[in-house]
Amino acid sequence: MKHLMSGNEATARGVYEAGIKVCSAYPGTPSTEILENLPQYGKDVYCEWAPNEKVATEVAYGASVAGSRAFCTMKMVGLNVAADPLFTAGYMGVNGAYVVVTADDPSCHSSQNEQDNRHYARAAKIAMVEPSDAQECKDFVRLACEISEEFDTPVLYRTTTRVCHSKGLVEFGERTEHVAPTYARNTRKYICAPANAYMNHPLVEERLKKLEEYGCTTAVENGLNKVELGDGKVGVITASISYQYAKEVFPEGTSFLKLGLTYPLPMNLIRDFAAKVEKLYVIEELDPFMEDEIKAAGIECVGKELTGNMYELNTELVRERVLGI
């Protein structure tokens, strides 16, 4: 049976199904409803409101170190408050899965700025996952947990206002109970003193290389990254809600590379896709996060000169600015 749910409601369901045991959050639109929808799952998930985003981040990280799968949520400006522990966790790694939701707000519907928090993933050198609809909001939580544990990394789970609040049909799965790994005292890993941080940094860089390879292989197999080949004339690289807009607007025969793992970018997959199309567009909201890196790799593409770097996109804007219709 399928259920009509918002992205936030579906994310809460994903937390339950992924076997996450601890969720801490600080309220703020567009993220608030995630934690609000968790108490219905009873004692399977311990959930709490924290006094601020930094505390929420630290509570969840403590649960991760102890071995539980852990989750915390906040709106995008809240990650400014939580940046200190997040960056340090990037160097220390995890025990149980550790997933941090940043709910971005293009067009400033309820926020004091329009910051693009994808840059936090690059700065903190951690993995980033972006769902594009309610079903993916649920499904990608489990994949984010698997990535976190396999690669010993926090995962930034980036949504946007439209992904959070738009509704779609969601097919449920069963909860998978996660067997918590035993906590082992490890001062080298979990005490990020300067000497330990110095030794951990090479491990972080190696982790990014492995994550990029994962994005080109396993992430395609499990549906996190999707390649949809058309007639080869036009190709679109996109992610998050922008995929929905582009999919509706571009004509039949258009090829799509839809990325769910958006940091690190799977550059070999992108090169292979670009080689199969005559003209390449990058469609994304706010900053040219993907576009800049793709162009830096020597891949010719068109993006922000058409779509701009402010405010939300929608089908009408993409149709007018990109296709000139």
What are these regions (language model features)?
Residues 1-134, 162, 291, 296-325:
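Thiamine diphosphate
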Residues 1-8, 131-325:
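Flexible, low-complexity linker and terminal segments
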